[in-house]
Amino acid sequence: DGVRLTKAQRSVYPHNDMSGLENALREGRSADRKLIITDGVFSMDGDIAPLDEIVDMAEEYDAMVMVDDCHGEGVLGEGRGIVAHFELQGRVTVEGGSYSKALGVQGGIIAGSEDLRNYALNHSRSWLLSGSQPPGVAAAQKASIEVLRDEPQHVERLWSNTNYFRDELSSLGFDTGVSTTPIIPVMCGESRVAQQLSRKLR
């Protein structure tokens, strides 16, 4: 929706298809500014973006990278997210995230350079008239980051539970797709079967 509001020219490349991305970058080579936008972890299938390849390609074509890491924070990179997972600190232009998933609070995160943050705060119409977070929420956000930093056992337990759950589903014959994260889909093949399974789980 944000891209539509900017009225910028946009290209959509097939899911995680690096040759498709490169074709789009070639076609837009003459543009003054280019921004590649991707999820870090895809919420439907639980697979992750090849962010290392995306960043390499962005640098080759002089493009910026924005990653929405709502489902990677608290999960990948010892809980620090997909940028840390691929050791790309300092090479991603904008990181977006959420406190409402793994961190269990509310609110969102936009991280980038100081210039980028100042520009966004002063030019984004949707932010100009919005209020600040209540102090209690800000304190809870800070505490959630401290827990993530100081208590790595939570991320370790998450992965232990994830691997156990996936292995048990597979042993029962369920297809869990291509997920490599704690988002584990169960492929049912058709909606009728999915609805029946859902009813039995209630």
Q: Where are these predicted regions, by residue range?
A:
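Structural motif of enzymes handling amino- and sulfur-group chemistry
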Residues: S132-E151, R157, N161, S170-S171
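Substrate-binding/gating loop at the entrance of the active-site cleft, primarily
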Residues: D1-T6, S19
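Active-site PLP attachment segment
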Residues: A84-Y119
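Conserved PLP-binding catalytic core of the aspartate aminotransferase-like
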Residues: E156-F165, S170-R202
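Active-site phosphate-binding strand-loop segment of PLP-dependent enzymes
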Residues: S11, H15-V67
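Helix C-cap/helix->beta junction micro-motif
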Residues: T6, E60-Y61, L172
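A short glycine-threonine-serine/GTX helix/turn-capping micro-motif
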Residues: Q106, S124-Q133
